[in-house]
Swiss-Prot record, chain A:
It is found in: Cytoplasm, Cytosol; Peroxisome matrix. Coiled coil: none annotated. The gene is PEX7. GO terms for cellular component: cargo receptor complex; cytoplasm; cytosol; peroxisomal matrix; peroxisomal membrane; peroxisome. This is Peroxisomal targeting signal 2 receptor.
Swiss-Prot record, chain B:
There is a cross-link at C5 (Glycyl cysteine thioester (Cys-Gly) (interchain with G-Cter in ubiquitin)). It comes from Saccharomyces cerevisiae (strain ATCC 204508 / S288c). This is Peroxisomal protein PEX21. One of its GO terms (biological process) is protein import into peroxisome matrix. Interacts with PEX7. Interacts with PEX13. Interacts with SES1.
Amino acid sequence: MLRYHMQGFSGYGVQYSPFFDNRLAVAAGSNFGLVGNGKLFILEIDRSGRIVEVNSFLTQDCLFDLAWNESHENQVLVAQGDGTLRLFDTTFKEFPIAIFKEHEREVFSCNWNLVNRQNFLSSSWDGSIKIWSPLRKQSLMTLTPRPLEITKMVDPLNAIILKKKSFTGISKNRNCVYQAQFSPHDQNLVLSCSGNSYASLFDIRLPSGKNQNNFLVHSGLEALTCDFNKYRPYVVATGGVDNAIRIWDIRMLNKNESATIKRTVPGQLHNSSCINEIPNAHGLAIRKVTWSPHHSNILMSASYDMTCRIWRDLSNDGAKETYKTNSTDATKGSIFNFTQHSEFVFGADWSLWGKPGYVASTAWDGNLFVWNGLG
Amino acid sequence: MPSVCHTSPIEKIIQQGHRIQNDSLIPSKRTKLAHTELTAHYATEDSHVEKHFLHNGSNFDGIDNVRYQNQPSPLTFITPNNTVDSSDWVPQFSSMKIDDSLEFSSEYKRLYSNYESQQRLNSSRQHLPFKNCMIRKTSCTYPPQKTLRQQRQGNRDNPTDAFQFDAEFQVLEREIQKERYEPITRRDEKWFDQDQSELQRIATDIVKCCTPPPSSASSSSTLSSSVESKLSESKFIQLMRNISSGDVTLKKNADGNSASELFSSNNGELVGNRHIFVKDEIHKDILD
């Protein structure tokens, strides 16, 4: 395990470079991101195994997420608390090379398109998702998840059960889009999750009004994270405030009835596209889920309970569907539990290089850890 | 010359005096007791009468004056002598009014009369002030009773006055309440603006969410013991407790609209990292 401490800053996001096997970028904020400066750290792992800082950029406001430019080895995009996105060149000092400003509130996530490598997207607390080109100051497109009446869609039985577990109930940050991701298989598909407990699937080729499909993912509580499976194009995972990880098959989303409640069999999940569930995967809300780039049935999660876990998706054995769920397993499919962090864990990423299983995680304690979850 | 042309003026006067005597209300009864006094009186009167007549004898207007001033005297009595000439003459003189040159003028008499009337009025006023007020309204220094009664009635029935009174009372009441409660507020509460209060509320919610109740059994808690121990030692949770209690809050910038630091509201010291201003600049000509 390797460790690097960012003095005075809390980690919010981490990502391995897609071009260099020993380079990482970390987005951080001071005072736990509540108020104050942000900082982008460019780190490298040297031959002796130490993590060293090769460059850093101080920003006016906190940084919540970052994404490497998939078409330029030295450029990193960051999502900032003042509603802007800034593109930095790691060979330069102090200032960014571009600023993208259209969002009206904090930008919570950003993601670079892995297919065409020419576009990136951002999601914000203002309830919108914007698609950009690094060559233009203005966004190319703005997507807005269709507002839905939460109280009418929530499954009453699940709501009662959740209330007994001392959950606070319906989300108050309904408009906040916590995360948005391009599909690694289709440059025109965008998946997002919001504070209104819905995940939205956008096909940006379709006209507005017909380009999105919404489905309830966390029973009325905030959905905080989502990710596409790297090998199964139609499988996505979500995590939220209900401490659960759910895995969905987007092929089963019915365009006409995706947002309605169906209860044909007692005990059956209210949405038939959910193919697996890891209930109580963590002790507190789940802030990050990310599928492994090396295995089709392994994913990682990071949580407010200060731990990172590696899970095996028991509904698939790597070659075919097994029709099992992790909730029926004694260990819930847990492979590894990383407990070295002492504050909320916000960022986690798999390494594309070296032995499969290496991951990097960062938390509000200011630490960056590099560890192996697959032994 | 005929004898008529030789009659003297004195005789004529005597004749006129006789006629006056007959027409007047002077009693003709004689009184013996006052004889001596009457004699003296006549002597004095004679000398005055003579002087008067002699002084005005050459003027015919004097006759009219004598007639005008002839007034009956209470001391005039008929003499015991019954002589036609002397008896007729003496009473006539005694009954005449003497015009005294030293007497006060009529104007003075009128003014004095007014003065006496005023004195009488003042005296009566002291005894009956209200009566006087009712009679002479113009001289009153205060309105009549009827007017006063009407004013009292108006004070009770006038809604405008009642409203003003109530308004003044309410203002006074508010001032008392403000004075009564203001010191307590200043002692017990810290003045936070909207952002600071919002942060405090959020911090309170976070502390409640992340801190299990002390009375709860370990088996009923949804958090593992390791997570609970981490949360209890968490610096973030400790910061939230301080914000929740009001000891730490946002430090406003000079413009008062935004905050970039945290500070202790007890001693004013900075909490956490100091904010460093970063210019909003870019490296140019990179993307071109």
